[in-house]
Regions:
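Conserved, mostly hydrophobic/aromatic
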Residues: 61, 266, 328
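Conserved phosphate/anionic-ligand binding catalytic regions in large, soluble enzymes, centered on
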Residues: 57-70, 324
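Active-site-facing alpha/beta catalytic cores
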Residues: 2-7, 88-243, 247-248, 270-271, ...
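Glycine-rich phosphate/diphosphate-binding loops that line cofactor/substrate pockets in enzymes
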Residues: 46-54, 256-260
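Internal helix-turn-beta structural module
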Residues: 304-345
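Short helix-capping segments at alpha-helix termini
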Residues: 83-87, 257-259, 293-296
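N- or domain-start disorder-to-order transition segments that initiate the globular core
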Residues: 9-49
Length: 349
């Protein structure tokens, strides 16, 4: 680069050093209890994906985490229900730290943990790992969405199930990432409802890949993966909802035609709820009816839930989402009871 004709970093205002993953892993090492829970839960979810377990996987929790205190209170309440319905449901808490934005907005606890535009990402990564460690130590397995190739090195060892979102399912690097993740992964259909891109993603992620990332020491590296056989589709709706009996049957047929497991998950939120959080219960009721009628290709559901229903722009109400609106705790209890009863009937001899 010359002073007369600069060509590099022209639009970059600042570059800050990021602490390497090993710094956080050293200060917040995974415990034997947490490792055992993650190991067991991953295997249980894999069994669900491959039809070896007849429980229903329930990924449930806040749209995003912005207050770790509220997240822990939510987890304590959810843990009671996890134990209560352990024969019918495999409950895993939704713990999302990064939010893909359609345009702009708060991008999550990791990106801006103080909610003030300071973008203290080093602190955000530490907060994320600390929360995940606490959750696993208390017996609550965690799930999250993976958005890039670097942050998984900071906390993926504490994740039991991962999601690739509707905006990134078609992305080559996210398919490559999924091929190397140690946990089962769900791929959402596209925002327009396109299911083929999710089916293609599962096929791609099941194969080995080479991609660029970083080591635990923070050095640039070429990662060679072995492929992930434990991936599945998430029906999240598109231009219209896609959770009905007909949609589930069609999706299962397409998966079988592609040589994949027909087991799939239904997202009760997003386009399936027509972006109205109250309609998540309607979706759950429809899924419950399908389960009672013997539908065995639905292996899981995803629900956006918090202590207080609705949403807010600023964190003024404790336990309420600042991103997508969520159902409240009372509705959460009703929904889990409904799903547990339905699955109990599905597997009854």
């Amino acid at each position: 680069m010359t002073k007369q004709h600069p060509t590099d970093d022209i639009k970059i205002r600042e570059v800050k050093e990021l602490l390497p993953p090993i710094a956080h892993l050293y200060e917040l090492p995974i415990s034997d209890e947490a490792a055992g829970l993650v190991h067991r839960t991953r295997h249980e979810i894999a069994d669900l994906v491959h039809g070896k377990d007849n429980r229903l996987l329930v990924i449930i929790g806040p749209c995003s985490i912005h207050d770790t205190k509220a997240a822990l209170e939510y987890a304590e309440r959810l843990l009671v229900l996890r134990k209560k319905y352990e024969k019918e449901l495999l409950i895993v808490m939704r713990v999302y730290f990064e939010k893909p934005r359609t345009t702009v907005g708060w991008k999550g606890l990791i990106n801006d943990p103080h909610l003030d535009g300071t973008f203290d990402i080093n602190y955000g990564l530490r907060q994320a790992r600390s929360l995940l460690l606490t959750l696993n130590n208390m017996g609550m397995p965690a799930s999250t969405e993976f958005l890039d190739m670097i942050t998984p090195q900071y906390y993926a060892d504490l994740i039991s199930w991962g999601a690739i979102g509707a905006r990134t399912t078609e992305s080559q690097v996210h398919r490559e990432l999924a091929s190397g993740l140690s946990c089962p992964v769900g791929f959402k259909n596209g925002t327009d409802g396109n299911l083929k891109i999710a089916i293609d993603a599962i096929g791609a992620a099941s194969h080995p890949h080479h991609f660029l990332s970083v080591t635990k020491a923070g050095h640039s590296a070429i990662v060679h993966t072995g492929g992930n056989p434990d991936c599945h589709v998430i029906l999240r709706g598109g231009k219209e909802p896609n959770y009905s009996t007909e949609h589930v049957k069609s999706a299962a047929e397409q998966l079988i035609k592609a040589g994949l497991s027909p087991k799939l998950m239904v997202d009760c939120s997003h386009a399936n709820s027509r972006k109205d959080y109250r309609r998540q219960m309607e979706v759950a009721q429809d899924v419950a009816a399908q389960l009672e009628n013997g539908e065995d290709n639905i292996m899981g559901v995803m629900v956006e839930s918090h202590l207080v229903e609705g949403r807010q722009d600023k964190p003024e109400v404790y336990g309420q989402s600042i991103t997508d609106a969520c159902i409240g705790w009372d509705t959460t209890e009703e929904m889990l009871a409904l799903l547990a009863a339905a699955n109990r009937k599905r597997v009854a001899p």
